[in-house]
């Protein structure tokens, strides 16, 4: 009897151990360029949430702390731990080739997301994909939003010269999103027949505190009373501008951002932010996770999903957000 009990216990323990092993038999390695980036924090949490719905997946999540060398080391460790796919938010897009060579050495597929590698890098490995956006689209939509509100608010034209005197807070120089948003927001305004005059343009590296400091300096400078519109490449910098304008009693100056972060949507609701552009964190996260899981399981990247892959790339569309359609994007 005791032998039977012991045997049964051993079998059950073996089954439980097997189930536990099976429950995490698909390891996916993830690196985020830095955890304290507002937008990437939302993406990271969304990926973690998606993974909870897939009990056979174990995420190995890493904070690269804005250090490409650190990220390279993290990828080496992930590969040594036997991950079946990599999901990589690059620190430096130029490092994609290095990451691909590491992945190729272990025959592991890699899904880059948010920071786009070069076409040459993607084409160099048949198991490399990218999930992101069309960077210029966000600039165009931001330009459309500004044009819409400029036409509806004649009081914004402080000197009545018919052109927008603007300052622009730029993201990381060289980052595809920063370069495209900076170029295309102004191009779209000009294409719509709206003349523009740049008073100031400088980087605040996607950061709220840096943007506040930059805006403080501009509001203390010789062009302070000429500023009619503040344009920011992302919401984090837009929020810094809003803080600075409030401190200088100039909250009536309109500010436009990109990302549609929850905090930014609250500012749109209050009127402190004139508009933003939805950079769809949840769908970027879901597409990244879906592709990585499929590839880890040996399936086609988009199998069983609604994602459309064009030349190894999934593009998640942007949407303009202001008070007129805010209810569609605010959490119920």
Swiss-Prot record:
Residues at which beta-D-glucose binds: 37, 114, 175, 177, 181, 234, 259, 279
Entry GO MF terms: calcium ion binding; carbohydrate binding
Domain notes from UniProt: The calcium-binding site is structurally similar to that of EF-hand proteins, but is in two parts, with the last calcium ligand provided by Glu-228.
Keywords of the record: Calcium, Chemotaxis, Metal-binding, Periplasm, Signal, Sugar transport, Transport
A GO cellular component entry from the record: membrane
Residues in the signal sequence: 1-23
Encoding gene (name): mglB
Amino acids binding beta-D-galactose: 37, 114, 175, 177, 181, 234, 259, 279
Function: Part of the ABC transporter complex MglABC involved in galactose/methyl galactoside import. In addition, binds D-galactose and D-glucose and plays a role in the chemotaxis towards these two sugars by interacting with the Trg chemoreceptor. Chemotaxis requires MglB, but not MglA or MglC.
GO BP terms, alphabetized: chemotaxis; galactose transmembrane transport; methylgalactoside transport
Family (UniProt): Belongs to the bacterial solute-binding protein 2 family.
Top-level taxon of the source organism: Bacteria
InterPro entries in UniProt: Bact_Solute-Bind_Prot2, MglB-like_PBP1, Peripla_BP_I, SBP_2_dom
Assembly and binders: The ABC transporter complex is composed of one ATP-binding protein (MglA), two transmembrane proteins (MglC) and a solute-binding protein (MglB).
Site feature location: Interacts with membrane-bound trg signal transducer: 97
Localisation: Periplasm
Pfam families: Peripla_BP_4
Positions bound to Ca(2+): 157, 159, 161, 163, 165, 228
Protein name: D-galactose/methyl-galactoside binding periplasmic protein MglB
């Amino acid at each position: 009897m005791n032998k039977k009990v012991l045997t049964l216990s051993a079998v059950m323990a073996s089954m439980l151990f097997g189930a536990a092993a099976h429950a995490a038999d698909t390891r996916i390695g993830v690196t985020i360029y830095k955890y304290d980036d507002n937008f990437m924090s939302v993406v990271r949490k969304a990926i973690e949430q998606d993974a909870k719905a897939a009990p056979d997946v174990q995420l190995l999540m890493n904070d690269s702390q804005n250090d490409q060398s650190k990220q390279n080391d993290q990828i080496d460790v992930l590969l040594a731990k036997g991950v079946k796919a990599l999901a990589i938010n690059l620190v430096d897009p130029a490092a994609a080739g290095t990451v691909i060579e590491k992945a190729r050495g272990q025959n592991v597929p890699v899904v880059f997301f948010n920071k786009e590698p070069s076409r040459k890098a993607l084409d160099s490995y048949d198991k490399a994909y990218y999930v992101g956006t069309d960077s210029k689209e966000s600039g165009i939509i931001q330009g459309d939003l500004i044009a819409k509100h400029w036409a509806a608010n004649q009081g914004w034209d402080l000197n009545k010269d018919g052109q927008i005197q603007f300052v622009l807070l730029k993201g990381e120089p060289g980052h595809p999103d920063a370069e495209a948003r900076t170029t295309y927001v102004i191009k779209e305004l000009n294409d719509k027949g709206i003349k523009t005059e740049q008073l100031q343009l400088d980087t605040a590296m996607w950061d709220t505190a840096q943007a506040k400091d930059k805006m403080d300096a501009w509001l203390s400078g010789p062009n302070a009373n000429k500023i009619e519109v503040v344009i920011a490449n992302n919401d984090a910098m837009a929020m810094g501008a809003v803080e600075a304008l409030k401190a200088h009693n100039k909250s009536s100056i309109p500010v436009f951002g990109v990302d549609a972060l929850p905090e930014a949507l609250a500012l749109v609701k209050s009127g402190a932010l004139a508009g933003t552009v939805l950079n769809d964190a949840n769908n970027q996260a879901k597409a990244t996770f879906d592709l990585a899981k499929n590839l880890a399981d040996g399936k086609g990247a988009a199998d069983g999903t609604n994602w459309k892959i064009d030349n190894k790339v999934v593009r998640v569309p942007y949407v303009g957000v202001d008070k007129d359609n805010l209810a569609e994007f605010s959490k119920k």
